[in-house]
Amino acid sequence: MLKSILVMSILPAQLIFGEIIGELTFDNRYFFNVGLQDQKKNHSSFSFSPEIFKDDSNRIFHFKAKLRKDSEDSGRNLNDIQELYLINIFEDKEIKFGVSKEFWGVTETSHRVDIVNQTDFTEGFDGEEKLGQPMIKISLERSWGLLDIYALLGFRARNFSGIKGRLRSPLSINEKNSLYSSSSKNKRVDFAFRWSNYYDNLDIAISHFSGTSREPRFLPSPNKINALVPFYEVIDQTGLEIQYLLDSLAIKGEVISRSGHGDRYTAATYGFELTQVGFLQTRMDLGWVVEFNHDDRLESSPFVLGTRFSFNDIYDSQILSGFIINDRSKELGFLLEASRRIGECCLLSLEGVYFDDTDEDNGKQKLFQAFMEDDFLRAEFIYYL
């Protein structure tokens, strides 16, 4: 069904707008150990992302799809319309209608407030990739700030790795029998708003979301042994984003208060990024990232120490590295990401993730326990059409 929609969408657009741009991607992940459920070490995937963009002064059309095929894990296969919207621009407002992706947040390591779109949970370890969300969005720009009002038409359930996949829970996820607290199930219309403004060097945003939680809880599956079923509850979440720029220092913070997902809880990510411009009298910039995480539901508050090298060359070369430290459970995670353009046609990126855990059973809640055999290196090659 979705493939038919893709074809029907692409062909008229090609006739109207001409050439289709896009990306072809080859992705290979090598895991250093066999998985806890005897999954293979080597996983590769191909993806194709066609895209069309047209800006006619007071009207904008955007189409982007993503099709992914994984060599081992059927759970990573994806046919998704990520953008298919029309924006009408008026003198005092903008109206967007269609499928789109909206990002909220200012911090680097955990985007607490970012809730409009469902996470593409099989794409990356950081959870930053999103699925398209049908919506109507009205944007009002006034002297007191920018107000975005959303009607979110229907719900996208989270995707999970299959039984042959990596970076998955020890128990399989029974996605097909997902449960909902709303009688409308995945047809419920959710609502959200976000107000944002800036005052000199201070950026601030306040948001509220009322609808089906993008993050499920898990219950024992009634018809599968050793399996869990996602349970999506109706929640209310209020969020605050703050970013203050002081020369080369950026102080950032996000905090949410959520009800409906079990007991009401508060979660926050806050920290700073200090940038050394012209590091060691070169053209490179070096950024130091320090962020702390808090969640009322967890007994520990892991923090992140990271660096970001920007080479400022014609190839847009960058290296990002960081340690995730959980002092109470004595866990340590390390992440390395590097990317570099190859001419104007291609991009090569590398990613490495390492988990370290003490063998000591100290009685503390473990964050990485399910991933202790999932240290990996990932290479991704993108060809721009």
Residue ranges and their predicted role:
Residues 20, 57-63, 92-95, 144-147, ...:
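Repeated loop/turn-to-beta-strand initiation elements of outer-membrane beta-barrel proteins
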Residues 24-30, 63-67, 97-99, 149-153, ...:
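Transmembrane beta-barrel strands of outer-membrane/channel proteins
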Residues 32-43, 72-80, 108-114, 160-166, ...:
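Outer-membrane beta-barrel translocator domains and adjoining extracellular loop/strand segments
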Residues 38-46, 77-82, 130-134, 141, ...:
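Residues that define the transmembrane beta-barrel architecture of outer-membrane proteins
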Residues 48-54, 83-88, 136-140, 193-197, ...:
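Residues on the lipid-exposed face of transmembrane beta-strands in outer-membrane beta-barrel proteins
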Residues 53-166, 200, 353, 357:
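Outer membrane beta-barrel
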Residues 211, 246-327:
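Detector for outer-membrane/organellar transmembrane beta-barrel domains
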Residues 272, 354, 371-385:
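Outer-membrane beta-barrel "beta-signal"
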